[in-house]
Amino acid sequence: MIITTTPTVENRQIIEYKGLVFGEVVAGANIIRDFFASITDMIGGRSGVYEDKLNVARQEALVELQKQARNIGANAVIGVSIQYQSMGKKDMFIIVATGTAVVIG
C-alpha cells in the first residue's frame, strides 16, 4: 500500500476516493523510570528512550491507518498528516495519523 503526504501519487491516477482514515495510538511514559534509564542519552542533549517510544508509536499509528484503508477497499492513502499531543499529566501522549484513502490505477 502506498502511503504519502502528497495529494497525489506521481504517474498514478486516482480512480476512487474512499474517505478519511485514521490511525490513533495512545502511549505512556513513566518519567522517573525513563529519566534514569536515559540519563546517558540526555547528557548528549537527546533522549533516545523517548525518541524510540515516539518512533514505535508513529509506526503503530501508520499501521492502523493502513488497516482502515484496506478495510474500505483502498490501495493507497494520500495527504497523510501525523499529529502529536500530550494528554493528562504529561505522562501520556497520543499520535494521530490521518489521510484520504483512495484507489489508484
Curated annotation (Swiss-Prot):
It holds the Pfam family YbjQ_1. Signal peptide: none annotated. Disulfide bonds: none annotated. Belongs to the UPF0145 family. This is UPF0145 protein HD_1349.
